[in-house]
Design a protein with these regions (language model features):
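Alpha-helical elements of Rossmann-like donor-binding domains used by nucleotide-donor carbohydrate transfer enzymes
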Residues: 22, 48-52, 106, 110, ...
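Acetyl-CoA-dependent GNAT
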Residues: 39-91, 95-97, 150
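Conserved G/P- and acidic residue-centered "switch" motifs that form tight phosphate/ATP-binding loops
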Residues: 72, 102, 132
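C-terminal "cap" of GNAT-fold acetyltransferases
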Residues: 122-125, 129-133, 142-161
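Short alpha-helical
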Residues: 18, 44, 85, 133-134
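Conserved functional loop/turn residues at catalytic and ligand-binding sites
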Residues: 19, 98, 102, 143, ...
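Conserved acetyl-CoA-binding loop-helix of GNAT-fold acetyltransferases
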Residues: 94, 100-115, 136-141
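A short, well-structured alpha-helix characteristic of acyl/acetyltransferase catalytic modules
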Residues: 1-50
Length: 161
């Protein structure tokens, strides 16, 4: 796996077929991960994830697999989706066993720096589930502000300084 950039504790690598089993474990964790996705999907198969990785690589998507520098354990994936007009949507999923260890805050602040400084985005926005209070807290800590809310989605944004 090729490392694209890094932070104090995290390597941000290209997505890889080597991590399919880790991806599947994460996205099919309904208790800690999947129930907060902003789309309804009960179960992901190995074929689903393989196609997702192959598409991400082929289309050079801005999606990164995060790995703990020290233990080499898979943390999760983070992505800048729909990059157009100097804006992108942030998406992040952290595997259940790596939650509540500060990786989310570190990953988001690092990706914001990469997106604003290296890629030249002026606005990064996101959507999350209103019941995902931990994530909303982290997003606010990283400088995101809420700009809209529906019964099933909270919309947040951050502008480049």
């Amino acid at each position: 796996m090729k490392t694209i950039f890094e932070s104090n504790r995290i390597l941000f690598n290209e997505v890889s077929l080597e991590l399919i089993d880790d991806y599947l474990k994460m996205v099919n964790d309904h208790e800690k991960v999947n129930k907060y996705f902003c789309f309804n999907r009960e179960y992901f198969t190995k074929d689903d994830e393989t196609t997702w990785v192959q598409t991400a690589i082929k289309e050079k998507k801005l999606v990164f697999s995060m790995v703990d520098k020290q233990t080499k354990s898979f943390i999760g994936n983070i992505e800048l989706m729909h990059p157009e007009k100097k804006e992108a949507e942030l998406g992040i999923a952290i595997t259940g066993s790596m939650q509540d260890l500060g990786f989310g805050t570190e990953a988001i602040t690092t990706l914001l720096e990469y997106g604003f400084t290296k890629l030249g985005f002026t606005r990064i926005y996101l959507r999350t589930h209103p019941q995902n209070a931990r994530a909303i807290h982290v997003y606010q800590k990283c400088g995101f502000t809420e700009y809209n809310r529906t019964s099933d989605t909270v919309f947040m944004e951050k502008y480049a300084n």
